[in-house]
Amino acid sequence: AGYDSERWSFDANYNEFLTIIDTIQTNRLDASASSRYLLKKYWFTSTSANWFSSDEQEISLRTTLLIGGGKYLLYDQVKTLQIGLGVAWNRENFTTENAVARESYELYLGNRFHLFDHKFFTIKSNMVGYASLTEDDRYRASVNLDFGWDIGDDFDLIWGYGLNFDSNPPNNAQQTDYVISLTIGWEL
């Protein structure tokens, strides 16, 4: 969901997946809320809060607060492309064999692309890379891609892909977690 005005934009996303194969259940949560304030010449300031949990990576909750800025490289009635840079505070609780809680500061670089109001389809992508400022040799990445097709009568078919990577998880937890989804959505 999102809201745009002449200077402000707000976005919120919530994706939760539950997978059961045989008798093994796997949960994944990916949620965010962000705001941007448009300055002159398509520059902007931004803040964001992200929440993530993954049974695959043994993360009970990762909370990341980001502050930064960037520039819109494309900004018109049907598409936006932006790049951003800033700092992040990261707090994680892991459910590994030995429960671990970590707190760190990171530098982030990200980009977003959104194609909307096209005749038959929409595209959303959000990619962010993180380099830890307080932990040696730790890098993280988050990638989300959504492709939506208008199938008529306010219904959409949406293909989604999400990837989360951590170069240095605790206690030999998995470095990557990904999800591929196919959903049907509708507009009210």
List each model region and its residues.
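Detector for outer-membrane/organellar transmembrane beta-barrel domains
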Residues: 66, 78-131
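Residue-level signature of outer-membrane beta-barrel architecture
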Residues: 2-5, 37, 51, 71-73, ...
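Repeated loop/turn-to-beta-strand initiation elements of outer-membrane beta-barrel proteins
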Residues: 6-12, 42-47, 77-81, 115-123, ...
